[in-house]
Amino acid sequence: MTDVGQYAADSGLALRAIGAGDLGFLDRLCSDPEALGPFEWPGFGDVRARRRRWEQDGYAGPDSTVLAVVLADGTVAGIASWRTVRRGQPDSGICYEIGLALLPEHRGHGLGTAAHRMLIDYLFKFTVAHRLEALTDAANVAERKALERVGFEREGVLREVAFRHGSWRDAVIYALLRDGP
């Protein structure tokens, strides 16, 4: 448990800044293939890279932010993130690509949908983002359903956009506008 503030919802979940006590959790994301699962884990990486990023800006930077998804008892269940993406003309508005990763023991219980709702609510309340996007592996049916449940609309398929587990993978892009579909 850290001493940083939380953004809570009625779902028993909270979003909060990454704290020093979460560094072991972040290490697991780099060193345990099961932690991120088959759709996200890119292979072994430099475990120290996540610690360096935390030391640099606490994972709350101007172009990307990562928050801990925390259960009511303080257990970190995963991470929620966003990063700025540029679309259209310069100064045409802010667009964030969001992401969510839950540890295997917390998947399949509706936490992903609840965490997506919290992240959407947070971004539309505290940023000027007009558009949110999410990309997911085309085979990640659970994530696709979660995105659709919270109002994202499928916009298309990015063919063979990511190389993972020995093959090129398609991704599906979803979007949600501040004022609805």
PLM region spans:
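Surface-exposed alpha-helical segments enriched in charged/polar residues
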Residues: 55-56, 121
